[in-house]
């Protein structure tokens, strides 16, 4: 089994919209929170800043920790190829340092990433957003409890 991986994610909200990366697979489009793996000797907040530059091309200011989510691959719909993955994800409230700057893919977008999109809260139920449980919490304005466990 692989070792447990830490990941820092950004929750960026503006005018009842959530900034997400737009991705495409064989099925359709899906949306993810910007962020990714923590590197050795890197603080989680620094990982969130670096990952946002890579994925959304924007500098962010990292605020409070909102959620801690575990992803245990064997328990989710992608178990066929993710069964040995165990990741602990830390979701931070972030804000854009330059909110009026042009938005688009960053300097190193993820493999399936095709763009960046401000998604209105009322659309979060209509799209594939991962993890969907956190999309629902944010849509409802619920920012607790911090530890949410292995939710999809």
Where are these regions (language model features)?
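Conserved N-terminal beta-strand and adjoining loop/helix that marks the start
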Residues: 1-19, 66, 91-93
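A generic structural micro-feature
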Residues: 2, 80-88, 108-113
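Conserved Nudix-box catalytic region and its N-terminal flanking loop in Nudix hydrolases
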Residues: 17-58
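A short coil-to-beta-strand element that immediately follows conserved catalytic motifs
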Residues: 59-68
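Active-site-adjacent beta-strand/loop module that shapes the phosphate/pyrophosphate-binding cleft
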Residues: 73-103, 137
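NUDIX/MutT-family hydrolases
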Residues: 105-138
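Charged phosphate-binding loop/patch that engages nucleotide di/tri-phosphates or the phosphate backbone
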Residues: 130-152
